[in-house]
Amino acid sequence: MQLPLLQPAIFIRRYKRFMADVELPNGEILTIHCANTGAMTGCAEKGDTVWYSDSKSTTRKYPCSWELTQLSNGSLVCINTHRSNQLVHEALQNKVIKELADYSEIYPEVKYGEENSRIDFLLKGEGLPDCYVEVKSITLVKNSIGMFPDAVTTRGQKHVRELLAMKKQGHRAVVLFAGLHNGFDCFKIAEHIDPEYDRLLKDAMRQGVEAYAYAGAFEKTQEIPTALSLTGKVPFIE
C-alpha cells in the first residue's frame, strides 16, 4: 500500500480525540487531524517523531493528517487506522493472506448480522462457503508481542458475536489482525486490557471462528516511509 507524501514533525500533544499539535522543523506549531479514536497506547509520546500528510484541501479545517509515529526504538506505527482496510484489501488481491487465497471475489463494507453491523470484507468463490472477514489493527506492541485491543472495545465484542452467528449459519468467519506496527513477531489478545473481548474471541475460536495475525513492513525512500504491506502470518499466542 502506497502511503501519501509524508513530512516529519515532533509530537507535542493529542487532544479532543481527533486533534494533535506537532512542531515542524522550522519551529512552527501545526494542528493536525488524528483519525485514530483509540487509546494509541505507546504511539503518542511527547517528543516522538510523527509523519503527517497534507491533503492541500481548502475546505477541511485541518488539512494535514497524522499518519505514522516513529518510536524511540526506531519502530514505525501507522496510527491512521482508516488505512487498515486498504492494506488488507491489497493483501487479499495479491493473495498474501494464504488462508483466504482461494477466494476470487472481494466485497468491502457489506451489511450483515442481527446487530446492524458492516463486515469489512465478504469473500466469495466458486464452490466455497461465503467468508466474512473482520479487520483489526495491531498498533500496540510490548516486548516484541503485538496485541489487540489497546482499550476496551465494545464494538469489537459485538463483531465477535456477529461472526460467531455467521459461523453457526454455515459460513466462514475470520478475524484478521493486521500489523500496522513493524516491531512484533508474535501476537496475543490483550486480555489485561479487555478481558471480555479475550473471552468472547477465544470462545468463538473454539466454535470455529478463525483468527490470524499478519505482520506489517514499511518501505522507505531516502529515510521517508513510502509504503506499508502485510508480509506473513505470525504465531498467535493464546
From Swiss-Prot:
Pfam families per the UniProt record, alphabetical: SfsA, SfsA_N
UniProt-recorded Gene Ontology molecular function terms: DNA binding
Gene3D superfamilies in alphabetical order: 2.40.50.580, 3.40.1350.60
Highest taxon in the source lineage: Bacteria
HAMAP family registered for this protein in UniProt: SfsA
Homology family: Belongs to the SfsA family.
Name under which the protein is recorded: Sugar fermentation stimulation protein homolog
Encoding gene per record: sfsA
